[in-house]
Swiss-Prot record:
Protein name in the entry: cAMP-dependent protein kinase catalytic subunit alpha
Gene3D superfamilies: Phosphorylase Kinase, domain 1 (3.30.200.20), Transferase(Phosphotransferase) domain 1 (1.10.510.10)
Function: Phosphorylates a large number of substrates in the cytoplasm and the nucleus. Phosphorylates CDC25B, ABL1, NFKB1, CLDN3, PSMC5/RPT6, PJA2, RYR2, RORA, SOX9 and VASP. Regulates the abundance of compartmentalized pools of its regulatory subunits through phosphorylation of PJA2 which binds and ubiquitinates these subunits, leading to their subsequent proteolysis. RORA is activated by phosphorylation. Required for glucose-mediated adipogenic differentiation increase and osteogenic differentiation inhibition from osteoblasts. Involved in chondrogenesis by mediating phosphorylation of SOX9.
Residues modified to Phosphotyrosine: Y331
Top-rank EC class of the record's enzyme: transferase
Localization terms from the record: Cytoplasm; Cell membrane; Membrane; Nucleus
Keywords: ATP-binding, cAMP, Cell membrane, Cell projection, Cilium, Cushing syndrome, Cytoplasm, Cytoplasmic vesicle, Disease variant, Flagellum, Kinase, Lipoprotein, Membrane, Mitochondrion, Myristate, Nucleotide-binding, Nucleus, Phosphoprotein, Serine/threonine-protein kinase, Transferase
Residue numbers binding ATP: 50-58, 73, 122-128, 169-172
Entry-annotated residues carrying Deamidated asparagine: N3
Organism: Homo sapiens
Membrane topology category: Lipid-anchor
Reported regulation of activity: Allosterically activated by various compounds, including ATP. Activated by cAMP; the nucleotide acts as a dynamic and allosteric activator by coupling the two lobes of apo PKA, enhancing the enzyme dynamics synchronously and priming it for catalysis.
Active site (UniProt): D167
Length: 351
């Protein structure tokens, strides 16, 4: 690297530092005094279910006054308690209302009633990366790199706030109208200084240290980034099997095989991210995220232009106008039932 290039890189890293320091101030204000009860169920017209989970569903809704569309996440308090997800759910809302980044889905309103918790988020009509990846088969390396760069920046932002995301997978990445990523589902996100021990995540994406019940840190997100980049570029994840236990055996073995079409730069990056030895894993070394940002596979990436959303996206989802749900699957519709008695008031008092 020439002197001029080195100087440019140095000044870029300085301005990132300044940006993150300011971002932390903004985050901490909202983290310390979270917004509560900023809307009511009656203000929204419910249109269609976009997805379902073990303790709730996500619906497309329309704000009756403004006509704006949103994605409303509805969580059944009693089911959340039964599945021991109280802490995770409170984390999700507290974190989402405090963060602000171009590739994180925005929480617009949150409220609760006798039966449910509600998180009303920006509606991202392009659907999940998962469905586009399965349809296309695999992404070209430049296509995968465009998405990967956004995740790198997002993790750099989250980690600077002491947040671990813990749930990276194509199902949690939505594609917006400009073809950029919106990370959704902060159900497993957590603010941690140092290490944590909870077993959570998706089998294919779990880092070895989580499987081995060791204390772990934000390096688990960089491992998951390696899994995601592999899956985007190959069309299948690096470790897969019929049963979770078999997947776990492959993950902790430290062996990974690459398709012959992977470039040597991509293989090199992945060996450094899918690195079982934490003292060698990229993102977890003394240079932090810069080992990843300065890697040869990302040589063509203009990080500032990605952040500013100035890079032309490789793929724009089909979009037929506001409220279009054609990029989402169909689900059986169900009435939202609200009890006349308050359920689990104590458990969710801070929501």
């Amino acid at each position: 690297m020439g002197n001029a290039a080195a100087a440019k890189k140095g000044s870029e890293q300085e301005s990132v530092k300044e940006f993150l320091a300011k971002a932390k101030e903004d985050f901490l204000k909202k983290w310390e005094s979270p917004a509560q009860n900023t809307a009511h169920l009656d203000q929204f017209e419910r249109i269609k279910t976009l997805g379902t989970g073990s303790f709730g569903r996500v619906m497309l809704v329309k704000h009756k006054e403004t006509g704006n569309h949103y994605a409303m996440k509805i969580l059944d308090k009693q089911k959340v308690v039964k599945l021991k997800q109280i802490e995770h759910t409170l984390n999700e809302k507290r974190i989402l209302q405090a963060v602000n980044f171009p590739f994180l889905v925005k929480l617009e309103f949150s409220f609760k009633d006798n039966s449910n918790l509600y998180m009303v988020m920006e509606y991202v009509p392009g659907g999940e990366m998962f469905s586009h990846l399965r349809r296309i088969g695999r992404f070209s390396e430049p296509h995968a790199r465009f998405y990967a760069a956004q995740i790198v920046l997002t993790f750099e932002y989250l980690h600077s706030l002491d947040l671990i995301y813990r749930d990276l997978k194509p199902e949690n990445l939505l594609i917006d109208q400009q073809g950029y990523i919106q990370v959704t589902d902060f159900g497993f996100a957590k603010r941690v200084k140092g290490r944590t021990w909870t077993l959570c995540g998706t089998p294919e994406y779990l880092a070895p240290e989580i499987i081995l019940s060791k204390g772990y840190n934000k390096a688990v997100d960089w491992w998951a980034l390696g899994v995601l980049i592999y899956e985007m570029a190959a069309g299948y994840p690096p470790f897969f099997a019929d049963q979770p236990i078999q997947i776990y055996e492959k993950i902790v073995s430290g062996k990974v095989r690459f398709p012959s079409h992977f470039s040597s730069d991509l293989k090199d990056l992945l060996r450094n991210l899918l690195q079982v030895d934490l003292t060698k894993r990229f993102g977890n070394l003394k240079n932090g995220v810069n080992d990843i940002k300065n890697h040869k596979w990302f040589a063509t990436t203009d990080w500032i232009a990605i952040y500013q959303r100035k890079v032309e996206a490789p793929f724009i989802p089909k979009f037929k106008g506001p409220g279009d749900t054609s990029n989402f699957d169909d689900y059986e519709e169900e009435e939202i039932r609200v009890s006349i008695n308050e359920k689990c008031g104590k458990e969710f008092s801070e929501f």
